[in-house]
Amino acid sequence: MELKALIFDVDGTLAETEEVHRQAFNETFAAQGLDWYWSKEDYRTLLRTTGGKERMAKHRENLGSGPSDAKIADLHKAKTQRYVEIIASGQVGLLPGVAELIDRAKASGLRLAIATTTTRANVDALIAATFSKPAGDIFEVIAAGDEVAQKKPAPDVYLRALQGLGLPPAACLAFEDSRAGLASARAAGLRVVLTPSEYTRGDDFSAADWRIPDLSAAATQAIPELP
C-alpha cells in the first residue's frame, strides 16, 4: 500500500528530551521537600515504566513507601510546568534529520501525526520551541498519553493516531526510540523505524523494520518509501 502518513513518537525521537524530564523531576522533588533524586542510571531503569505519574508510583513501590497517589498527581503537575519552562528556554533542539525529514514529508504530500506517552502540554512546548509554530500547524493529529486508557507498550495511542488520520496501519510508518514504543506501534499493526536515543542505546530492537542511527537524509535513504 502507498505510504500516506508518518507517525512520530516525541521524547527521544524528535528531540533528546529525557534528560530534561529527569532534570524537571529532580528539581520538583527538591522544591517540594521530597528526598528523592533520580540519577541517570535510576532514570534509565525507571523509563521501562511509561508515564510520569506511573514512574513515580513505581519508584515509591521500589522504596516501599512514599507520597500518596494524590500527592504524586500534584508532583506531576509541578514537574510538567517545570519541564515546559526548561523547554521554552530553548535548551533543547531537534535531533539530526528531524526537521529535514518533516519538511520533505510535507513537500511530498505525506501527512504527519504524533503518538506519544507524554502530555499534550509537553508536546506543545517542544514543538513551539523547536519549530516556532504551534504543534497543530505541523502535525495533523496529536495523540497524547493522557488521552488514552493505556500507555505504551499498549497500542492505544497509535490506534488513536490512526483513527484521527482515518488510515490503515499499512499506509503509515511509525518512528520510535524505545522498546515500549516499538511494542506499541507493532501491536497497532505499524511498521517501525527505530532510532535509538541516549537512554535506549544497547536495547534489543530486533523487532523493528528498520534501525538507523538518526533521521538524517543519509540514514533514511535505507528506507525507499521515504522522500
From Swiss-Prot:
InterPro entries: CbbY-like (IPR044999), HAD-like_sf (IPR036412), HAD-SF_hydro_IA (IPR006439), HAD_sf (IPR023214), PGP-like_dom2 (IPR023198). It comes from Rhodobacter capsulatus (Rhodopseudomonas capsulata). Belongs to the HAD-like hydrolase superfamily. CbbY/CbbZ/Gph/YieH family. The gene is cbbY. GO terms for molecular function: hydrolase activity. It holds the Pfam family Hydrolase. NCBIfam families: HAD-SF-IA-v3. This is Protein CbbY.
